[in-house]
């Protein structure tokens, strides 16, 4: 990054994208990027392949989660942040991941993300349902999705 470049609010995501190019920004960091919920994580949440080598990062607080198969590859969007291409899960996939990891981040966070995603029209019901099936949380999310309509 050039010395005179402006640092954005997503600087840590750009730094993570540069140091872990095969990783995908997920969960709380993806929620913050998409403007969903009130969570403001102090570390960057990154999804990596199940058998990938764990990156060693200095000067960057990061939490790694291991995803495999279609759960890793589905719903990836590429965004340009500070000149770096950063891979971030889309809103529907991020919400489904929040339900998948509800014991780690809290059910209240997942519900808030779902509510905000629906109210801000970041994803359709079909996109949310497809992501729920891929993340294998369709039965968990069904009552909450039904309550939205």
Q: How would you name each of these model-derived features?
A:
Residues 1-149:
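Nucleic-acid-binding surface
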């Amino acid at each position: 990054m050039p010395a005179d470049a402006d640092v954005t609010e997503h600087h840590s995501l750009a730094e993570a994208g540069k140091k872990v190019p095969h990783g995908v920004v997920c969960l709380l960091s993806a929620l913050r990027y998409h403007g969903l919920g009130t969570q403001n994580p102090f570390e960057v949440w990154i999804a990596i392949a199940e058998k990938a080598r764990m990156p060693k990062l200095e000067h960057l607080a990061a939490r790694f989660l291991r995803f495999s198969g279609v759960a890793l590859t589905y719903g990836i969007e590429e965004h340009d942040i500070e000149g770096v291409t950063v891979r971030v899960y889309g809103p529907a996939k991020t919400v489904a991941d929040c339900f998948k990891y509800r014991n780690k981040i809290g059910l209240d966070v997942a519900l808030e993300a779902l509510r905000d995603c629906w109210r801000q029209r970041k994803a359709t019901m079909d996109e949310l349902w497809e992501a729920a099936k891929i993340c294998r949380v369709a039965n968990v999310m069904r009552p909450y999705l039904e309550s939205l309509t």
